């Protein structure tokens, strides 16, 4: 016996989430339909609302409902510092560590040629434009210490080397292969304080 077409479509839709395979998607679909229909409605409404209202900030590329996000609009931030992170979760970790008061640029990924992710896919043209805005003096590369994160940091360092900017890399208080999202705020704060210049 085959499942109803609408149930199959829901299961396949849930598989687009990271780390969700066919069995997990099936369990989620059954749970939402059988045990938590109110939760399913909230999920559908929230997703619909987010798709309609959330966009990328014109300056930092982070998610926002405004043209320019709250961080980029703040007069309390230091516009001379620009911290480059891979994902919004990395920006959130930096903010929770209370170790940085400059501006950000969120790549929304990292270079991964095997996955078809090159400079265009992670908005390096927008990063270059932002770095050239005459306010930025230092670019802090806070990509993850994974192979792809290191390659991304190296590529950006090379791209910006002739722009008259100080280019630094967060210190390796973070474990090799580690991702910012999973690091405690104290370790992250120390890594930012001990950043080193990229040569």
Curated annotation (Swiss-Prot):
Please give the biological process terms from Gene Ontology that the record holds.
DNA recombination; DNA repair
Signal peptide, first to last residue:
none
Q: Which domain of life is it from?
A: Bacteria
- Domain Toprim, by residue range, is 80-175
Chain ranges of zinc fingers (C4-type)? 57-72
- GO molecular-function terms, A-Z: DNA binding; zinc ion binding
InterPro entries referenced in this protein's UniProt entry, alphabetically: DNA_Rcmb_RecR, Rcmb_RecR, Rcmb_RecR_Znf, TOPRIM_dom, TOPRIM_RecR
Has the keyword Zinc been applied to this entry?
Answer: yes
Q: What does this protein do?
A: May play a role in DNA repair. It seems to be involved in an RecBC-independent recombinational process of DNA repair. It may act with RecF and RecO.
The family assignment reads: Belongs to the RecR family.
Please give the name of this protein. Recombination protein RecR
**Organism, per UniProt?**
Nitrosospira multiformis (strain ATCC 25196 / NCIMB 11849 / C 71)
Which gene produces this protein? recR
């Amino acid at each position: 016996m085959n499942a109803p077409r609408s149930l199959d479509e829901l299961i396949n839709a849930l598989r687009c989430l990271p780390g969700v395979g066919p069995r997990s998607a099936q369990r989620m679909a059954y749970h939402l339909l059988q045990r938590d229909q109110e939760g399913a409605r909230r999920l559908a409404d929230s997703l619909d609302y987010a798709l309609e209202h959330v966009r990328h900030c014109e300056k930092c590329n982070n998610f926002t409902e405004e043209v320019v996000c709250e961080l980029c609009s703040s007069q309390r931030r230091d516009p001379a510092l620009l911290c480059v992170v891979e994902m919004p979760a990395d920006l959130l970790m930096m903010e929770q560590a209370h170790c940085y008061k400059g501006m950000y640029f969120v790549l929304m990924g990292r270079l991964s040629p095997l996955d078809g992710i090159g400079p265009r896919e992670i908005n390096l043209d927008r990063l270059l434009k932002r770095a050239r805005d005459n306010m930025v003096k230092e670019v802090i590369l806070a990509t993850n210490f994974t192979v792809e994160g290191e390659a991304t940091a190296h590529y950006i360092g090379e791209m910006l080397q002739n722009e008259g900017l100080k280019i630094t890399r967060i210190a390796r208080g973070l474990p090799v292969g580690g991702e910012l999202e999973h690091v405690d705020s104290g370790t992250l704060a120390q890594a930012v304080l001990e950043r080193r210049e990229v040569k």
